[in-house]
């Protein structure tokens, strides 16, 4: 089994950038690298075909210059599911290479409800009501790594 990491309750697989051309799958993906026991997230996206998307990705060179070495992928066949989960990832991590505005707390709430992520929806709602600061750094400790 390939290495995996749990992110927002889902298991993402580690895929070296050089191997993305072998994955002709619909997925949500993160451009990332590991340093010590942390994973640094540089970009979050979604695509109907990973192989085609990575071939000429507009942020791949920038991600590599920041140290990114691999993609973290979650296969997601449904287009709406991919878009909503990408919204959650951009809200949660605020990756520095995503040029779009960070989703609002209510956009994150709607995306979380669609994806069945009620704990994330509660955080987004609390942030919207001014009860919490949801800012999550684009770096996290990989406490739930599954190594195969």
Model feature map: region roles:
Residues 1-42, 46-148:
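Boundary/linker segments flanking structured domains
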């Amino acid at each position: 089994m390939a290495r995996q990491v749990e992110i927002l309750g889902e298991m993402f697989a580690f895929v070296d950038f050089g191997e993305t051309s072998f994955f002709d799958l619909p997925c949500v993906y993160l451009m990332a690298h590991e340093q010590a026991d942390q994973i640094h997230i540089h970009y979050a996206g979604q695509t109907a075909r990973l192989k085609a998307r990575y071939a000429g990705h507009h942020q791949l060179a920038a991600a590599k210059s920041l140290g990114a070495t691999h993609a973290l992928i979650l296969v997601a066949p449904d287009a709406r599911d991919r878009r909503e989960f990408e919204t959650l990832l951009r809200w949660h991590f605020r990756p520095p290479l995503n040029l779009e505005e960070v989703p609002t707390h209510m956009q994150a709430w709607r995306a979380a409800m669609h994806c069945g992520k009620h704990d994330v929806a509660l955080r987004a709602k609390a942030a919207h009501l001014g009860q919490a600061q949801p800012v999550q750094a684009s770096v996290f400790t990989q406490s739930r790594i599954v190594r195969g």
